[in-house]
Amino acid sequence: MVTSQQSTAAAGSVPLELPYYGAPIGVAVKRFFTKYATFTGRASRSEYWWWALVNYAVLLVLGILALVAGGTPQVSVDGTVAPPAGGAIVVVLIITVYSLATIIPGLALTARRLHDGNFSAWFILIALIPGIGGLILFILTLLPSKPEGARFDQGSPQYS
């Protein structure tokens, strides 16, 4: 079933207020930063999962750089641990800045993804349940879009 919004996506750009179903990777990343702290509205699965892939790839590369730069602790024979090399400290600082810069938009994107499945953004807090919370949130973000999720859009009566 093709919705009017999906046919709009084929013809041109999708308004930021609407989810972009079938978003390409570049558009998904651009929308992630454009909607930096927007917790209202919805995000399609492609918007969410393309960003997740890019985010994990960036963190993987930075983590490898930290290890290559001397981030593994070196234990000597007498049991003392040498401090990490200066390069590793720089990379860890970059990882910290990157993580701080993407935590708010990451939470906003997750909230919008939950909205698209017709769940409240408060379901993000389920990730705080030890052990199973993260898995439950992961499954919720995998679920397909529901038309009822439109109630979270900015023009809906809930936000009027």
Identify the function of each model-found stretch.
Residues 2-54, 106-122, 139-160:
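Membrane-interface extramembranous regions at the lipid-water interface
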Residues 4, 59-103, 127:
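Membrane-helix interface segments in multi-pass membrane proteins
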Residues 47, 51, 88, 92-96, ...:
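Residue-level signature of transmembrane alpha-helical entry/exit and packing/kink sites
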Residues 53-63, 133:
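Hydrophobic alpha-helical membrane-insertion segments
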Residues 67-69, 134, 140-141:
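Short, charged/polar low-complexity linear motifs in solvent-exposed/disordered segments
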Residues 75-76, 133, 149, 159:
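A broad, structure-centric signal for solvent-exposed, well-ordered loop/edge residues
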Residues 93-96, 100-113, 121, 134:
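Amphipathic alpha-helical interface surfaces
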Residues 127-133:
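Short hydrophobic membrane-inserting alpha-helices and related fusion/pore-forming segments
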